């Protein structure tokens, strides 16, 4: 049972479903450390709202409104001000930023978030997506407890899907396969 006395935000601004899934064990570890569900700031194309809405350690999914045309609500200087306002309204106590961005660091400070945990600034070159996140969490909250990524789906959704797609339980069925495209995004068979 979670106690809702602390509000924590995790920022995962990489694109895609696979990128978000890769970070789930680290977000879960933060949740377990502080015994609160985590708010998650992600890009819209992560589709996190479509597959993390049943995940017990995720409280709210906030969308980072940026796009390729650089005219999203959170793009540019005006966008940074909008994001500061959005985060300030949520009154977060802590933020975990899974990147080396000075922009997000300053946004967190101006939003009044007191405890900011982040990858080392200006050290983006050659970062391994998994190893960097693992070291970041180990160093930030002094814990080495990590699980494999898991997506929680309620039983009714599973049963409705089985019925809708006429899935036979005696057959081998692959329902969802998520992966990354680069060598630093591959999860080893044993983690």
Identify the residue ranges that each predicted region occupies.
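Catalytic machinery of carbohydrate-active enzymes
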Residues: 1-191
